[in-house]
Curated annotation (Swiss-Prot):
Enzyme Commission number(s) from the entry: 3.4.23.-
Gene Ontology cellular component terms for the protein in this record: extracellular region; lysosome
Protein name per the record: Aspartic protease 17
Tissue-specific expression: Expressed in intestinal cells.
SS bond partners: C309-C345
One GO BP: apoptotic process
Length: 391
């Protein structure tokens, strides 16, 4: 463990540090439940998974965080998921006019699709791409173009996917594509991920993510900040606990132990930090122990664990030991009101089937809302700092 205090503010005053706001989609589950469409969504989702093999691990089936980008010359605006669990960038092809590319009408979101014919800087490659995510497939063809991140930050000749086929998970989310922030080894088709093309423009090869507290499930809005080239000293504590990465694919590292209530488990676990996953994913073997400690019950119809909403503030902390330091997650963060009946709330923890050298835990937005995550590319490490919130 390395505990570092950020007393070196001067280097972050240059123009090579860029802070850009993020926005939340709100809870997809809540929207589908409210519309009476969630069971239909689950059936379609299961059918799509039967004959696929996943590579990037992110799960976009609930709340996700987006950044505003532009692609092309002149620039065309798109809202992309900021995803540390995958490494590719893709946008939706304007020529794709089916229901999945156009998006679910109930999302109240008009898709911003990319029209390659209107970009003078677009160059099409003679290559197709196909990416199977944790829950959802997208495919199309590859090309290069200019990508704007905001604040004058631009990547020229970024290789990206132009998607003309999407699965249901992407169809129902109010988003226009993915901006992958993982390592090159995870990239499909051996493309260079955006962050690797961005590094030369930054003070230091670092980016940090701060997500604001969860908002009412039915609303989206401004909900965080991503800082390229430095650490968000306004929204994050000065004390940062760093741990080395165990693999430069995902942002993967070792966790020393986990505890909730009277249950504890110690010993190394492979964990990843994933801004593209809404919840925390835990090993199957531990899910029952977590459910026991929180008095959660399995909701067969909605395929989630639930607890009484009245216990949202009184449940035990989820305590993660990382780099010798304790990182408790309060129950107000991992118990979510998504509009279920009978005063029930969702336990924002899902099972993960681990194998080989991959992760056995995923720390998604539930964890990141409580702790700023600092992604240090240059030193192949990840850091965690207490997040500041106004309420």
């Amino acid at each position: 463990m390395h505990l570092i205090f950020l007393l070196f503010l001067a280097p972050f005053c240059s123009a090579a540090v860029f802070q850009l706001p993020t926005k939340s989609t709100g809870s997809l589950r809540a929207k589908l439940i409210r519309a009476g469409k969630y069971q239909e969504f689950l059936i379609t989702q299961h059918a799509a998974r039967l004959n696929t093999i996943s590579q990037p691990i992110s799960d976009y089936s609930d709340e996700v965080y987006l950044g505003n980008f532009t692609v092309g010359t002149p620039p065309q605006p798109v809202s992309l998921v900021l995803d540390t669990g995958s490494a590719n960038m893709w946008v939706i092809d304007a020529s794709c006019d089916n229901m999945f590319c156009n998006g679910w009408i109930g999302s109240n979101y008009t898709r911003q699709k990319f029209d390659t014919s209107k970009s003078s800087s677009f160059s099409r490659e003679n290559r197709k791409f196909s990416i199977q995510y944790g829950k959802g497939l997208c495919s199309g063809y590859l090309g290069t173009d200019t990508v704007g991140l905001g604040g004058g930050l631009t990547i020229r000749k970024q290789e990206l996917g132009i998607a003309n086929k999407l699965d249901v998970d992407f169809a129902v989310q109010p988003m226009d594509g993915i901006f992958g922030l993982a390592w090159p080894a995870l990239a499909v088709d051996q493309i260079t991920p955006p962050m690797q093309n961005l590094i030369s423009q930054l003070d230091v090869p670092v980016f940090s993510v701060w997500l604001d507290r969860k908002i009412q499930a039915s609303h989206g809005g401004s909900a965080g900040m991503i800082t390229y080239g430095g650490i968000d000293t306004k929204n994050c504590d000065a004390g940062v606990t760093y741990v080395p990465l165990t693999a430069k694919t995902y942002w993967q590292f070792k966790m020393d132990g986990f505890a909730v209530g009277t249950y504890s488990q110690y010993g190394y676990n492979q964990v990843i930090s994933d801004t593209g996953s809404s919840w925390i994913s835990a090993p199957y073997a531990m899910i029952n122990d977590i459910a026991t400690q929180t008095h959660a019950t399995w909701d067969e119809m909605n395929e989630i664990y639930t607890v009484k909403c009245s216990t949202m503030k009184t449940q035990p902390d989820l305590v993660f030991t990382i780099g010798g330091a304790l990182f408790p997650v309060k129950s107000v963060e991992y118990i979510l009101d998504i509009g279920l009946d009978e005063g029930k709330c969702a336990l924002a923890i899902s099972p993960l089937m681990a194998s080989g050298f991959g992760p056995s835990w995923i720390l998604g937005d539930v964890f990141i809302r409580q702790y700023c995550n600092i992604y240090d590319i240059g030193n192949a490490r990840i850091g965690f700092a207490n997040a500041h919130h106004s309420f």
